[in-house]
Protein backbone atom coordinates (compact mmCIF):
# COMPACT_ATOMS: atom_id res chain seq x y z
CA UNK A 1 0.00 0.00 0.00
CA UNK A 2 0.95 3.62 -0.48
CA UNK A 3 1.02 5.18 3.00
CA UNK A 4 -0.18 8.79 3.16
CA UNK A 5 0.12 11.12 6.16
CA UNK A 6 -2.24 14.14 6.07
CA UNK A 7 -0.95 17.23 7.85
CA UNK A 8 -3.60 19.91 8.22
CA UNK A 9 -2.11 23.32 8.96
CA UNK A 10 -3.74 26.40 10.39
CA UNK A 11 -2.61 29.83 11.52
CA UNK A 12 -4.43 30.55 14.77
CA UNK A 13 -3.92 34.04 16.20
CA UNK A 14 -3.32 34.62 19.91
CA UNK A 15 -5.51 37.77 20.05
CA UNK A 16 -8.36 39.13 17.96
CA UNK A 17 -6.26 42.14 16.89
CA UNK A 18 -3.32 40.04 15.58
CA UNK A 19 -2.86 39.51 11.86
CA UNK A 20 -2.71 42.40 9.39
CA UNK A 21 -3.98 40.21 6.55
CA UNK A 22 -7.40 39.46 8.05
CA UNK A 23 -10.49 41.47 8.73
CA UNK A 24 -13.88 40.80 10.22
CA UNK A 25 -16.03 41.13 13.30
CA UNK A 26 -14.27 40.91 16.63
CA UNK A 27 -16.33 37.93 17.80
CA UNK A 28 -15.25 35.96 14.72
CA UNK A 29 -11.57 36.76 15.25
CA UNK A 30 -11.03 35.75 18.86
CA UNK A 31 -8.74 32.77 19.57
CA UNK A 32 -11.80 30.79 20.68
CA UNK A 33 -13.68 31.54 17.46
CA UNK A 34 -10.65 30.65 15.35
CA UNK A 35 -10.17 27.41 17.28
CA UNK A 36 -13.81 26.44 16.74
CA UNK A 37 -13.59 27.32 13.04
CA UNK A 38 -10.44 25.24 12.57
CA UNK A 39 -11.97 22.32 14.48
CA UNK A 40 -14.73 22.31 11.84
CA UNK A 41 -12.21 22.65 8.99
CA UNK A 42 -10.06 19.84 10.43
CA UNK A 43 -13.06 17.50 10.54
CA UNK A 44 -14.13 18.48 7.01
CA UNK A 45 -10.62 17.95 5.60
CA UNK A 46 -10.44 14.50 7.18
CA UNK A 47 -13.82 13.66 5.67
CA UNK A 48 -12.45 14.53 2.20
CA UNK A 49 -10.05 11.61 2.55
CA UNK A 50 -12.67 8.95 3.24
CA UNK A 51 -13.17 6.00 0.88
CA UNK A 52 -9.75 6.07 -0.75
CA UNK A 53 -8.78 3.31 -3.17
CA UNK A 54 -7.80 0.05 -1.44
CA UNK A 55 -4.14 0.47 -2.40
CA UNK A 56 -3.94 3.73 -0.39
CA UNK A 57 -3.56 3.76 3.39
CA UNK A 58 -4.38 7.12 4.95
CA UNK A 59 -2.98 7.55 8.45
CA UNK A 60 -4.81 9.69 11.02
CA UNK A 61 -4.39 13.38 10.19
CA UNK A 62 -2.04 15.55 12.21
CA UNK A 63 -3.37 18.84 13.57
CA UNK A 64 -0.62 21.36 12.74
CA UNK A 65 -1.87 24.60 14.27
CA UNK A 66 0.59 27.39 14.92
CA UNK A 67 0.30 31.05 15.86
CA UNK A 68 1.51 34.29 14.32
CA UNK A 69 5.15 33.51 15.09
CA UNK A 70 4.92 31.03 12.18
CA UNK A 71 6.77 28.35 14.14
CA UNK A 72 5.35 24.86 13.95
CA UNK A 73 5.20 23.41 17.48
CA UNK A 74 7.74 20.66 18.19
CA UNK A 75 4.84 18.38 19.18
CA UNK A 76 3.71 18.37 15.53
CA UNK A 77 7.17 17.29 14.35
CA UNK A 78 7.26 14.65 17.10
CA UNK A 79 4.02 13.16 15.74
CA UNK A 80 5.42 13.13 12.21
CA UNK A 81 8.78 11.70 13.32
CA UNK A 82 7.06 8.85 15.16
CA UNK A 83 5.70 7.46 11.89
CA UNK A 84 7.85 8.97 9.13
CA UNK A 85 9.70 5.72 8.37
CA UNK A 86 6.54 4.02 7.14
CA UNK A 87 5.19 7.07 5.26
CA UNK A 88 5.48 7.32 1.46
CA UNK A 89 3.65 10.62 0.95
CA UNK A 90 3.19 13.70 3.12
CA UNK A 91 -0.15 15.34 2.33
CA UNK A 92 -0.21 18.99 3.49
CA UNK A 93 -3.71 20.47 3.57
CA UNK A 94 -5.13 23.80 4.71
CA UNK A 95 -2.56 26.45 5.54
CA UNK A 96 1.11 25.76 4.97
CA UNK A 97 3.01 24.10 7.78
CA UNK A 98 6.33 25.92 8.33
CA UNK A 99 9.50 23.79 8.01
CA UNK A 100 7.67 20.72 6.70
CA UNK A 101 10.19 20.68 3.85
CA UNK A 102 12.76 19.19 6.26
CA UNK A 103 11.40 15.74 5.39
CA UNK A 104 12.85 13.95 2.37
CA UNK A 105 9.52 12.51 1.28
CA UNK A 106 7.16 13.02 -1.63
CA UNK A 107 4.84 15.96 -0.97
CA UNK A 108 1.35 16.06 -2.44
CA UNK A 109 -0.31 19.34 -1.50
CA UNK A 110 -4.12 19.20 -1.53
CA UNK A 111 -5.09 22.84 -1.85
CA UNK A 112 -6.67 24.92 -4.57
CA UNK A 113 -4.75 28.11 -3.90
CA UNK A 114 -1.49 29.93 -4.35
CA UNK A 115 0.14 28.71 -1.11
CA UNK A 116 0.10 25.10 -2.26
CA UNK A 117 1.72 25.98 -5.57
CA UNK A 118 4.30 28.14 -3.82
CA UNK A 119 5.15 25.43 -1.27
CA UNK A 120 5.44 22.80 -3.99
CA UNK A 121 7.78 25.01 -6.03
CA UNK A 122 9.86 25.70 -2.93
CA UNK A 123 10.16 21.96 -2.17
CA UNK A 124 11.20 21.26 -5.75
CA UNK A 125 13.87 23.97 -5.53
CA UNK A 126 15.29 22.01 -2.57
CA UNK A 127 15.32 18.79 -4.59
CA UNK A 128 12.17 17.34 -3.02
CA UNK A 129 9.48 15.68 -5.09
CA UNK A 130 6.32 17.78 -4.79
CA UNK A 131 2.95 18.03 -6.53
CA UNK A 132 -0.23 20.06 -6.12
CA UNK A 133 -3.74 18.63 -6.39
CA UNK A 134 -6.66 21.00 -6.55
CA UNK A 135 -9.35 18.44 -5.67
CA UNK A 136 -10.05 14.82 -4.76
CA UNK A 137 -10.13 13.74 -8.41
CA UNK A 138 -6.57 15.02 -8.93
CA UNK A 139 -5.49 13.46 -5.64
CA UNK A 140 -6.89 10.02 -6.49
CA UNK A 141 -5.20 10.01 -9.91
CA UNK A 142 -1.80 11.12 -8.56
CA UNK A 143 -1.81 8.75 -5.58
CA UNK A 144 -2.62 5.87 -7.92
CA UNK A 145 0.41 6.73 -10.07
CA UNK A 146 2.63 6.96 -6.99
CA UNK A 147 1.33 3.58 -5.84
CA UNK A 148 2.14 2.04 -9.25
CA UNK A 149 5.66 3.45 -8.97
CA UNK A 150 6.03 1.96 -5.49
CA UNK A 151 4.91 -1.44 -6.76
CA UNK A 152 7.32 -1.32 -9.70
CA UNK A 153 10.17 -0.29 -7.38
CA UNK A 154 9.54 -3.29 -5.17
CA UNK A 155 9.37 -5.70 -8.13
CA UNK A 156 12.17 -8.14 -8.85
CA UNK A 157 12.37 -9.86 -12.22
CA UNK A 158 14.20 -13.14 -12.65
CA UNK A 159 15.62 -13.50 -16.15
CA UNK A 160 16.83 -16.98 -17.04
CA UNK A 161 19.29 -17.03 -19.92
CA UNK A 162 21.65 -19.33 -21.74
CA UNK A 163 24.48 -17.01 -20.75
CA UNK A 164 23.92 -14.19 -23.23
CA UNK A 165 22.38 -10.86 -22.37
CA UNK A 166 18.64 -11.13 -23.14
CA UNK A 167 16.76 -8.61 -25.18
CA UNK A 168 13.74 -6.98 -23.56
CA UNK A 169 11.72 -5.91 -26.55
CA UNK A 170 11.39 -5.92 -30.30
CA UNK A 171 11.54 -2.17 -30.94
CA UNK A 172 12.75 -0.87 -27.59
CA UNK A 173 15.57 -3.38 -27.22
CA UNK A 174 16.59 -2.53 -23.66
CA UNK A 175 19.90 -4.38 -23.61
CA UNK A 176 20.96 -3.26 -20.17
CA UNK A 177 18.52 -4.13 -17.35
CA UNK A 178 20.49 -1.77 -15.10
CA UNK A 179 18.64 1.05 -16.85
CA UNK A 180 15.37 -0.29 -15.42
CA UNK A 181 16.84 -0.35 -11.92
CA UNK A 182 18.26 3.17 -12.12
CA UNK A 183 15.19 4.71 -13.69
CA UNK A 184 12.34 2.80 -12.04
CA UNK A 185 13.92 0.96 -9.11
CA UNK A 186 13.02 -2.44 -10.58
CA UNK A 187 15.64 -5.05 -9.79
CA UNK A 188 16.61 -7.50 -12.53
CA UNK A 189 18.31 -10.72 -11.48
CA UNK A 190 20.00 -12.59 -14.31
CA UNK A 191 21.13 -16.19 -13.96
CA UNK A 192 21.73 -19.19 -16.22
CA UNK A 193 18.60 -21.27 -16.74
CA UNK A 194 20.56 -24.39 -15.76
CA UNK A 195 20.84 -23.12 -12.17
CA UNK A 196 17.14 -23.73 -11.50
CA UNK A 197 17.62 -27.45 -12.12
CA UNK A 198 20.25 -27.95 -9.41
Label for each model-derived stretch:
Residues 1-198:
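An N-terminal assembly and electron-transfer interface module characteristic of large anaerobic redox
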Amino acid sequence: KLVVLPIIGSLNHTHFWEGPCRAGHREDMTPEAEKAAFDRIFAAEQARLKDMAPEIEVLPAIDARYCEDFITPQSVFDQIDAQINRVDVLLPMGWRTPKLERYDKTFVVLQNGNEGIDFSAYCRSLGREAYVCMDRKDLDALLHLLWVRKVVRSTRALVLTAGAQPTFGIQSLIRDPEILRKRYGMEIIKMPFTSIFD
